[in-house]
Amino acid sequence: MLFRSELQNGYQKYFEENKERICDTNYTDETFETEKIALVSNPIHTGPKEPVVWYQLGELMKNAKERVKIHTPYIICNDMMYNTWKEIAERVPDFSIMTNSVANNGNPFGSADYARNRNRILNTGIDIWEYEGGYSYHGKSILIDDDLSVIGSFNMDMRSTYLDTELMLVIRSKEINKQLEEGMMEYERVSRQVLEDGTYRDPYHVEPIELTKKRQRNVLLVQHLLGWARYLF
């Protein structure tokens, strides 16, 4: 109780001394009701980990009825991860992922691995959208149907799956799902859909980032020299 009293007094003192800096905002008016919130985490020990977050996200996505939409900066998968996506694609009518294009990706390892494995990703049945916004996209979120939202630090890569201690917040709320979708669509309007023949569907008339010769050389160099260590990136 003493600590709480000290905290309240400290806040009141700060408020009186900084009135002009404090905005007049009632944050309660800007919140949404939720049915449930859960935090999903990988184990916290150092070294290799059981892919807890991947398993749990996979089960959530497999149980979707209509759609799953993923945003991730990087895609670096192994067989187990590709198989999870195949299962989701077989069950869910609308299954898509947005990631950086090869030219737009700020991570040379992620860019090189994606360039090499793009067709394999497509073969899982997932629709790929490539972001061309001019700066490397770094959002990590998932929409499941119209009521489930997942936001956090997890990339769709092996490092997040097996090495890092990642967190994802799972929220059941139609209002938050709608708000998150609006934010995600702002980026998708600067993206193009990759088709199976290597061409693009471009409903938003996006100007793609140029894949320079220097960038192409760097991609090839990383593929040849560091492909063996792809799970680290």
Predicted features and spans:
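Charged, low-complexity intrinsically disordered terminal segments
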Residues: 1-233
